[in-house]
UniProtKB/Swiss-Prot annotation:
CDD domains: ALDH_F18-19_ProA-GPR. It holds the Pfam family Aldedh. The gene is proA. This is Gamma-glutamyl phosphate reductase. It comes from Agrobacterium fabrum (strain C58 / ATCC 33970). One of its GO terms (molecular function) is NADP binding.
Length: 428
């Protein structure tokens, strides 16, 4: 339905209730669809995206022109941008989801009771998932593919900034569903950009939506977490830290820190704070900071850092709490692993942290005493990604402690039920 027609009807709620009912109806046959049928749909989607590359790029150019006219930040435009390589990556991501094991029906635990009952815990789809996102058009494909593989229907509400790109990609997903004989309403894209549609989706649409997954900036995620009446898989922000210990290999530290910050500055796994062991100031601090500066990164330092490296802007209290999503990093000197743990515990968003060290005791403390969703040793924080974890595409990163945590892949989009086999037992 065209957006103008919907706006003229003044009935966003009715539209969303219809979408919710259609998703619920589609979720039933989808929940029992076989692996081969779901994979057929996924492979057809990937092929359709490749075949529609020019149409997708043309749609993306409309979004980019609007973004540039609005003067949006470079990091925002980067997340919005599609090109040949990124479209190929979207198609490959869908194929990687098709190659994953189907979690639905997997027996994840089984045991026998003394009375002879045989009990199995079995993976099942969640049902209907609502995904709310902003500028990343690839989320349309990633979310659609993952939800489908896990047997879930999905309602996609993309941002106005990516509306043309998302519609072009969504058309390819619907084509794949049609080819495989699956309900076309299994993957729906909300056809309006009115924010009232978000509020309706967060209400749960009278019980038709089981989970909400937001992908976007802090204000979006905060609104979702505040208003949602159904469970939410999300992270508020990615304030990711790297700690360089005195035992770290210097060349490794330089390479990892630069990659973690500069590979893609606008993603949630980009490092925002660098912590350097006080015992490594003379050996590691200046070379690592210089590597960042040479890579084009702005460095803001605490006073001990500025005492060693001249010309840096002073880091403020606000900097330690900031997700820059830009070529900016804050650097502090800390009192060894204890100081690093204290700093991270104070300022972390519990997303991703990395330690660069050769001392196994330091690594053990880092892993045992920090509680972020993802902890890395001698590796870039930019590996905080479902694809890099072997999950195929991810629907997001969750930092909560209920149900899903870390990359939300196909397994995390399932629940479970119990199957109990008896031979006539009755309870006394």
């Amino acid at each position: 339905m065209p957006e103008q027609a919907v706006k003229q009807s003044h009935d966003i709620d009715a539209l969303m209730m219809t979408i919710g009912a259609q998703a619920k109806a589609a979720s039933r046959p989808l929940s029992i669809a076989g692996t081969d049928q779901k994979n057929r749909a996924l492979l057809a989607m990937a092929s359709a995206i490749e075949a529609s590359k020019e149409a997708i790029l043309a749609a993306n150019r409309k979004d980019l022109a609007a973004a540039e006219s609005a003067g949006l930040a470079a990091s925002f435009v980067d997340r919005l941008t599609l090109n040949d390589a990124r479209i190929a990556g979207i198609a490959e991501g869908i194929r990687s989801v098709a190659a994953l094991a189907d979690p639905v029906g997997e027996v994840i635990a089984a045991w026998d009771r003394p009375n002879g009952l045989k009990i199995e815990r079995v993976r099942t789809p969640l049902g209907v998932i609502g995904v709310i996102y902003e500028s990343r058009p690839n989320v349309t494909a990633d979310a659609g593919a993952l939800c489908l593989k896990a047997g879930n229907a999905v309602i996609l509400r993309g941002g106005s900034d990516s509306q043309h790109s998302s519609r072009a990609i969504h058309a390819c997903l619907v084509q794949g569903l049609r080819i495989a004989g699956l309900p076309e309403n299994a993957i729906q894209l909300v056809p309006v950009t009115d924010r009232a549609a978000v509020g309706a989706l967060l209400s749960g649409l009278k019980g038709t939506v089981d989970v909400i997954v937001p992908r976007g900036g802090k204000s979006l995620v905060a609104r979702v977490q505040s208003e949602a009446r159904v469970p939410v898989f999300a992270h508020l922000e990615g304030i990711c830290h790297i700690y360089v210990d005195k035992s770290a290999d210097l060349d490794m530290a330089k390479a990892i820190v630069v990659n973690a910050k500069m590979r893609r500055t606008g993603i949630c796994g980009a490092a925002e704070t660098l912590l350097v062991d006080a015992s490594a100031v003379s050996s590691h601090l200046e070379p690592v900071v210089k590597a960042l500066l040479d890579a084009g990164c702005e460095v803001r330092g605490s006073q001990p850092v500025r005492n060693v490296v001249e010309g840096l802007e002073a880091a403020t209290e606000e900097d330690w709490r900031t997700e820059y999503l830009d070529a900016i990093i804050s650097v502090a000197v800390v009192d060894g692993i204890s100081g690093a743990i204290e700093h991270i515990g104070t300022y972390s968003s519990n997303h991703t942290e990395a330690v660069i060290a050769e001392d196994p005791d330091v690594v053990a403390r880092f892993f045992n005493e920090l509680d972020s969703a993802i902890l890395l040793h001698n590796a870039s924080t930019q590996f905080a990604d479902g694809g890099e974890f072997g999950m195929g595409a991810e629907i997001g990163i969750a930092t909560g402690k209920m149900h899903a945590r870390g990359p939300v892949g196909v397994e995390q989009l399932t629940s479970f039920k119990y199957r109990v086999h008896g031979t006539g037992q009755t309870r006394t």
